[in-house]
């Protein structure tokens, strides 16, 4: 009987050890699912992005990288600036682990720049802001990614960016808040958001910064036209907190470090009647 009890105890110990090992491996697999992070000094951090995959080499070697510190822009006045032709369309909200993204499932409209059309694909947020103005970073930055309707022409991508400082709630985020709350820590999960009108995002198309840069996440593809609103919108601290809670710990501050300007020109485009 003692032998049976001994065998049973020994067997139980082995089972527990195997179970613990299995859980440990599973936890390791979850951690390894992320391909990059924003943690300074991490093996997957921004300074290592260009070494993680061959196709991400531009993150390290590129000379036209984003984000940048915007200072001393060249003033440009014009009668015709950015034109928005957005329209309401069904969308989904996706927790990508490193950010929260709204992706429109159909034709959500486009923007016109120099008589060229770029379709709106998705929008996502970074906190704090990725770009800076004279060394100042803001509480949050929204990116709206657009792709050219003619892929044979360059640039093929345009990102419209909006800065936010802490203040009144942002109406667009308020509408999406309940869905975002349901996606907290639900990496790679998405939910239908119904019909979302991009016009609800308060853009300033009469005064904006413009320069040529890159995507701010791997693969850091260059040749991206950046349109950054000069006007600063507001967002509540609770809304920023929600965006940070929804993603993994490694992405609560999901802003890439500032990149070298490398003699690129930054322009400030304002309508001829604009006074600011």
UniProtKB/Swiss-Prot annotation:
A GO MF label: zinc ion binding
Region span, Substrate binding: 216-217
Key words of the record: Disulfide bond, Glycoprotein, Lyase, Metal-binding, Signal, Zinc
Signal peptide: 1-27
Catalytic residues of the enzyme: 98
Tissue: Confined to nectaries.
Database matches in Pfam families: Carb_anhydrase
Record InterPro entries: Alpha_CA_prokaryot-like, CA_dom, CA_dom_sf, Carbonic_anhydrase_a-class, Carbonic_anhydrase_a-class_CS
UniProt xrefs under SUPFAM superfamilies: Carbonic anhydrase
Disulfide bonds: 59-220
Catalyzed reactions: hydrogencarbonate + H(+) = CO2 + H2O
Record: glycosylation sites: 134
Annotated Alpha-carbonic anhydrase domain residues: 34-270
Binding, Zn(2+): 124, 126, 143
PANTHER family xref list: CARBONIC ANHYDRASE
The family this protein is said to belong to: Belongs to the alpha-class carbonic anhydrase family.
Protein name stated in the entry: Carbonic anhydrase Nec1
Organism name: Nesocodon mauritianus
